[in-house]
Amino acid sequence: MPPANARPTWLLAVGDHFSRLSEDVMPTLIGSPARIEAAGNKPKIIEEFIGRVNSRHEALSIAKMTSPQGWEEPGQTPDFEEFTIVLKGMLRVNYRGGHIDVRAGQAVISHSGEWVRYETPEEGGAEYVAICVPAFAPFNVHRDEAE
């Protein structure tokens, strides 16, 4: 049995940042997200709370996305896992074998090295939270070339 003050193993696995924490470190408030430009055919709002831009974390990123009806982005083969929780509407995740419609209250995991393309085809668009491990960056998303 681990000692009472041991950190959970999942926390240590997320990245070196967490394993370096000491007991005298206090919580860090993220006062507001950074707005990041989104890829796609229509404007989409990306609010990064934790990640390379807003908090200088490379181990993971957490962002809230708001995309309009009819938004779609180029396909990608990322070097990260993306864990997505849909808060409102429906997010369609296209993959080589078809697509998955992820609705409010559901989640989906897109795996590193697998091709995916996201879109929000239904009325009202979608609002969702994406967690990427390691953190999202333009250099590790590997978007499809424009045709």
Model regions and ranges:
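A short, N-terminal "cap"/entry segment at the start of jelly-roll beta-barrel domains
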Residues: 10-59, 66, 74, 141-147
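Ligand-binding loop in jelly-roll beta-barrel domains
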Residues: 112-138
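Short histidine-centered beta-strand/loop micro-motifs
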Residues: 51-52, 72-78, 95, 119-121, ...
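Histidine-centered metal-chelating micro-motifs
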Residues: 72-73, 92, 108, 112-118
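Short acidic-glycine-tyrosine-enriched beta hairpin
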Residues: 97-112
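Short, conserved beta-strand element in jelly-roll/cupin
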Residues: 64-67, 78-93
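Structural motif
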Residues: 90-92, 99, 115, 125
